[in-house]
């Protein structure tokens, strides 16, 4: 096991950097109960995307976060940014900036929104927002057994989390169960704990560069908080107004595998295909043009080599991020079908040939030859390729394919391969911070989904770790959990990583 390497405790660093880290870690140990209580407080405030709230609403998660930062920090400058209102209500990004001796930046982000909890009955005590204490153990490779609230559940886990169990000596961990514990309020606590510890430990010293913490709204839907921070496209957001020519690095804090740095992720495009035909009475279907049927003809042939070759043509053979995948027909609707707010389906026009149909494609894609330049050409290629394919297979219908810019996220990659990524200065420092904290080399991974890094990197072009955070699982499922020890380890890892990136003067 790699855990036999032991904790290095930053032995490669010199004073005063090592002293600040040691004192900061001691502060975190002394305030462990307080930090865990803060996590419970954040979880108790529902923040499904759109309900994150504002700094002047103490009953919201953003208000609670801001109040804590205002009360418990002295050197950091706090700021908020109203994200443009939509039907989801007013909400704000929350920032903490600790000025350093130079313009070198270390930017760390988290997100404050969660997905919906689902059925309350699936959670301990029927309350997804009341943190429950349980245990988790790996029952066999690729599977865990979670015990909480008198229940025992066996679940499969991702390979990266499974590998973490191979690296550790213990076979069981205490966990905290609740909606948002893992995704992503534990990461918020890691950053707040690290900042408070850093202020306590710096004394007469200052950071060698400037630390920026951004707690962002709307990650789960369209990354609206990250886009507002960096204003992807025109660079007039909060970040670029303050740092016009930024130099530095970025770490996106998110529920992960125990501080195993994710060095990239594929891009994502949700393509909406609309087919319009001609309606007629169902007794004479030959007089119309069935939009649903013609759409189905196109969907039935997307696995053919000719389509695969065409849609994959701009992309490189990407050994880091992997190959392009196309999931066709992820949703489909046509004719006169409605779903009410309670989820009941209502049908009308069952005796009519449908004159319209919409279906969606989920496309995950690697880098292209000109990456990261010209991402809009890739978006246009996906639209044109899918529309042309369905149009060629279908009959007398009109076909259009569109990718909403809000649903288009370019890939992010730190290097050409995992081996090369390990040697990137930012990655090597995240590994050392983790090794010093948890006692083993966590390795590197590639994130399975997109994170706020897609928006942040495309606007700033700063080297970015796309995911780094505490260990846990079941992020979008009932019984979501984070490992208790990993929350505290996260604060320790982030204070060390901050010192490694910026130094102390």
Please place each PLM-identified region on the residue numbering.
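Metal-dependent amide/peptide-bond hydrolase catalytic core
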Residues: 1-30, 47-48, 60, 77, ...
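Acidic/histidine-rich catalytic neighborhood of metal-dependent amide-processing enzymes
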Residues: 168-264
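Conserved hydrophobic/aromatic beta-strand scaffold that supports enzyme active sites
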Residues: 93-97, 250, 272, 360
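Acidic/His- and Gly-rich active-site-bordering loop/insert found
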Residues: 4-181, 200-207
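Short, highly selective alpha-helical patches that border small-molecule cofactor pockets
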Residues: 58, 62, 66, 188-191, ...
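Short beta-strand segments
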Residues: 109-111, 215, 251-254, 467-469
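Short glycine-aspartate micro-motif
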Residues: 105-107, 176, 246-252, 272, ...
């Amino acid at each position: 096991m790699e855990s036999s390497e032991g904790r290095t405790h930053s032995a490669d660093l010199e004073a005063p950097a090592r002293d600040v880290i040691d004192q900061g870690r001691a502060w975190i140990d002394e305030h462990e109960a307080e930090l865990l209580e803060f996590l419970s407080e954040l979880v108790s405030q529902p923040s499904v995307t759109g309900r994150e709230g504002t700094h002047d609403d103490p009953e919201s998660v953003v208000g609670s976060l801001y109040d804590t930062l205002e009360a418990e920090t002295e050197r950091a400058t706090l700021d908020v940014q109203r994200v443009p209102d939509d039907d989801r209500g007013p909400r704000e990004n929350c920032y903490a900036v600790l000025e350093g001796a130079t313009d070198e930046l270390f930017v760390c982000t988290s997100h404050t929104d969660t997905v919906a909890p689902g059925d309350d009955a699936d959670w301990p005590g029927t309350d997804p927002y009341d943190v429950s204490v349980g245990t988790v153990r790996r029952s066999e490779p690729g599977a865990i057994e979670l015990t909480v609230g008198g229940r025992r559940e066996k679940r499969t886990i991702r390979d990266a989390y499974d590998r973490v169990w191979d690296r550790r000596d213990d076979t069981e961990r205490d966990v905290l169960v609740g909606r948002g514990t893992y995704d992503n309020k534990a990461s918020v606590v890691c950053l707040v704990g690290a900042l408070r510890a850093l202020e306590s430990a710096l004394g007469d010293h200052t950071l060698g560069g400037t630390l920026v913490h951004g707690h962002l709204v709307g990650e789960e839907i369209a990354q609206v908080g990250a886009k507002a921070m960096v204003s992807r496209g025109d660079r007039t957001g909060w970040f670029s107004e303050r740092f016009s020519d930024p130099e530095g690095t970025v770490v996106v804090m998110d529920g992960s595998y125990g501080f195993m740095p994710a060095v990239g992720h594929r891009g994502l495009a949700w393509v909406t295909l609309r087919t319009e035909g001609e309606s007629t009475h169902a007794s004479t279907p030959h007089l119309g043009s069935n939009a649903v049927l013609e759409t189905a003809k196109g969907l039935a042939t997307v696995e053919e080599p000719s389509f695969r070759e065409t849609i994959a043509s701009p992309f490189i053979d990407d050994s880091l991020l992997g190959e392009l995948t196309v999931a066709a027909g992820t949703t489909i609707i046509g004719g006169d079908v409605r779903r009410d707010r309670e989820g009941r389906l209502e049908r009308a026009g069952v005796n009519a040939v449908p004159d319209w149909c919409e279906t969606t494609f989920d496309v995950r894609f690697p880098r292209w030859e000109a990456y990261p330049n010209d991402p809009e050409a890739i978006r246009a290629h996906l639209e044109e390729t899918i529309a042309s394919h369905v149009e060629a297979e279908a009959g007398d219908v009109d076909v259009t394919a569109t990718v909403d810019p809000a649903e288009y996220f370019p890939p992010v990659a730190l290097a050409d391969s995992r081996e090369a990524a390990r040697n990137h200065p930012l990655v090597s420092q995240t590994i050392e911070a983790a090794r010093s904290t948890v006692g083993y080399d966590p390795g590197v991974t590639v994130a399975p989904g997109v994170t706020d890094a897609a928006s942040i990197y495309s606007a700033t072009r700063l080297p970015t770790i796309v995911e780094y955070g505490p260990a846990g699982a079941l992020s979008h499922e009932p019984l979501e959990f984070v490992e208790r020890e990993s929350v505290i380890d996260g604060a320790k890892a982030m204070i060390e990583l901050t010192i490694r990136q910026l130094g102390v003067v």
